[in-house]
Amino acid sequence: MENQPKLNSSKEVIAFLAERFPQCFSAEGEARPLKIGIFQDLVERVGGEMNLSKTQLRAALRLYTSSWRYLYGVKAGAIRVDLDGNPCGELEEQHIAHARQQLEEAKARVQTQRAAQQAKKREAAAAAGQQDEGVRRERKPRPQQPRRKEGAEQRKPRPVAAKAPREERHTPVSDVSVLTVGQALKVKAGNNAMDATVLEITKDGVRVQLTSGMSMIVRAEHLVF
């Protein structure tokens, strides 16, 4: 028992629980609603294993039940399950409403953070533009070129070839298992790539939400970073 490895993060604890109780916990995809009072069941079943403490179990449960994929699973008609996957009653309406509220608040926080990041980028770009303008103003004027003598042949300026616009390079998503709920990526649509956020990973593909608010299931070959 003394040589048991120690789980250092809540994500590692969740992965351990998903392996130990696969009918109850899941490491990816939509999660099933948990039985009320399942914390005490966990303490009795895994207490002492992997050097897990009650504090670690409580923190892992909090992270698991606040994730987007868990909140998506708390919906009308869903059944709570115990550690062995046995049904433990249908969800109450107040629990469904609370989960829906938590999900909307989480989405709003992501949108706020994204808007703040975009604002910082715009401010940095504007500041860089002002610095460039100041450098141009400080440059000394060029000396005037002497006029050419009359009759001298004037050289025709060479046409400047227009530079082709640089294509934005994207990295294709080769393995959906590396994606996480809430992660930002892009959805390919022809020659364009639209910003999107991962809502859940399903067996049919990845459900994403576009910046327009529309959600859809997209196959991995149409996703890029």
From Swiss-Prot:
Disulfide bonds: none annotated. Residues 137-146 have a biased composition (Basic residues). It holds the Pfam family ProQ. The keyword Cytoplasm applies. One of its GO terms (molecular function) is RNA strand-exchange activity. Keywords: Chaperone, Cytoplasm, RNA-binding. Residues 103-173 are annotated as: Disordered. InterPro entries: ProQ (IPR023529), ProQ/FinO (IPR016103), ProQ/FinO_sf (IPR036442), ProQ_C (IPR035236). One of its GO terms (cellular component) is cytosol. Its main location: cytoplasm. One of its GO terms (biological process) is post-transcriptional regulation of gene expression. Residues 109-118 have a biased composition (Low complexity). It is found in: Cytoplasm. Residues 147-156 have a biased composition (Basic and acidic residues). SUPFAM superfamilies: FinO-like. Transmembrane segments: none annotated. NCBIfam families: PRK04950.1. RNA chaperone with significant RNA binding, RNA strand exchange and RNA duplexing activities. May regulate ProP activity through an RNA-based, post-transcriptional mechanism. Belongs to the ProQ family. This is RNA chaperone ProQ. It comes from Klebsiella pneumoniae (strain 342).
